[in-house]
From Swiss-Prot:
Pfam families: F-box, FBA_1. NCBIfam families: F_box_assoc_1 (TIGR01640). It comes from Arabidopsis thaliana (Mouse-ear cress). Transmembrane segments: none annotated. SMART domains: FBOX. InterPro entries: F-box-assoc_dom_typ1, F-box-assoc_interact_dom, F-box-like_dom_sf, F-box_dom, Gal_Oxase/kelch_b-propeller, SCF_F-box_component. This is Putative F-box protein At3g17500. PANTHER family: BNACNNG10540D PROTEIN (PTHR31672), F-BOX PROTEIN CPR30-LIKE (PTHR31672:SF13). Coiled coil: none annotated. Residues 1-45 form the F-box domain.
Length: 381
């Protein structure tokens, strides 16, 4: 019985159990549940435990878990299947979502900013800065401090009018529960399609002054932007989407204007972190554009072992002009399959699919400063 084992040995065993399995075990024993709440243990668990790569989807302002089965496709033994498993998480209308280190940074339709761990169910609302402006964008990142993650949020806001541009950049630090402006970080780029890797944020970007596309990284340790290279710099290529591969590499979807092809490229660096200055790329998959001409705003992830890519998009169609939610599975030898997962109103946000790695990481809570008790004055008679 594990209950008779020394506590340090129990911790060592539990630290290797996947997060979702450990979540189910927490009610088994009080000491196990205490491990679950111990920050030291959760940090050790995030390093040692086997990673689980799940798929989540933001659809109609709610997050759903997605079951994806790509087994035996190339052998024609079974057809691929994608199933929405149902809505997960708190009852809030989510308009934007960003995944980092097992945490989801959510912006809501009623203009709130929430941090949520779907694995533990923990949430925390972050109050907006007094300088907050509508249409601000937010990303979550962290800095490694002696193997501990120090979390921060970047708020960025841009205003354009003809040749006039105004930008604001603020950092929220969880440790101090406060916002502060940061200066001299303006990348002079238009950005889209942000993803998180090893605590830093990466965007697809365009430098209008130099007329080039690139990848832009925000390094949370120095709070500065850095420029990185795409696989191809030719003007006859367009960047469409960015994705993360098993928390180790980046992948990018490119559209060729000179041929009827889209291409997925994957980085091959030994590691990618804040010290990486140059990205090394290899072509992962070529896609015939004639099979996906109607794509408008895709999100995607890849399966390296099966040499396949799964795309998600929504397009307007049908008698009632509803937005059809579609998954597209594409592989080698011109393998192509469409899977319909439901309709949504036109005005709802486009579906967004992403890999999610469950984690026991605890959301830092704001420090509550107790009020000083006033001394009662004694009546002198």
């Amino acid at each position: 019985m594990m209950s008779n084992l020394p506590l340090d040995l129990v911790e060592e065993i539990l630290s290797r159990v996947p997060a979702t399995s450990l979540k189910r075990l927490r009610s088994t024993c009080k000491s196990w549940n205490n491990c679950y709440k111990d920050q030291r243990f959760t940090e050790k668990h995030s390093v040692i435990a086997a990673k689980q790569f799940l798929v989540l989807m933001l659809k109609d302002c709610r997050v759903s878990s997605v079951s994806v089965n790509l087994n035996e496709i190339h052998n024609n033994i079974a057809a691929p299947s994608i199933e929405l498993k149902g809505v997960v998480g708190p009852q809030m209308q989510i308009s934007g979502i960003f995944h980092c280190d097992g945490l989801l940074l959510c912006t809501t339709k009623d203009d709130r900013l929430e941090v949520w761990n779907p694995c533990t169910g923990q949430t925390r609302r972050v109050q907006h800065s007094i300088h907050y402006k509508t249409n601000s964008e937010f990303v979550l990142g962290y800095v490694n401090n002696n193997s501990r993650h120090s979390y921060k949020i970047l708020r960025y806001w841009n205003f354009y009018m003809s040749n006039y541009r105004v930008s604001e950049f603020e950092i929220y630090d969880f440790s101090s529960d406060s916002w502060r402006f940061i200066d001299e970080v303006n990348p002079y780029c238009l950005t889209e399609g942000e993803v998180s890797l090893k605590g830093n944020t990466y965007w697809l970007a365009s430098d209008e002054k130099r007329d080039i596309d690139l990848i832009l990284r925000f390094d949370f340790s120095i709070e500065r932007y850095q420029r990185l290279n795409l696989p191809i710099l030719k003007s006859d290529y367009e960047t469409e989407a960015l994705s993360v591969v098993r928390e180790k590499q980046l992948s990018v979807l490119l559209k060729r204007n000179d041929t009827l092809e889209r291409e997925i490229w994957v980085t091959t660096n030994d590691k990618i972190d804040h010290t990486t200055k140059n990205l090394l790329w290899i072509k992962f998959l070529a896609i015939d554009q004639r099979t996906c001409y109607h794509w408008s705003c895709v999100s995607f992830f890849i399966d390296e072992e099966k040499k396949m890519a799964v795309f998600c998009d929504g397009y307007i169609g049908g008698i009632n002009e509803t937005s059809r939610r579609m998954f597209y599975i594409i592989g080698e030898d011109k393998y192509y399959r469409e899977l319909y997962v439901g309709d949504s109103p036109i005005r709802s946000h486009r579906p967004f699919v992403f890999n999610y790695v469950p984690s026991l990481v605890q959301i830092p809570q704001a420090t509550v400063i107790p009020k000083r008790r006033r001394r009662k004055r004694k009546n002198r008679n």
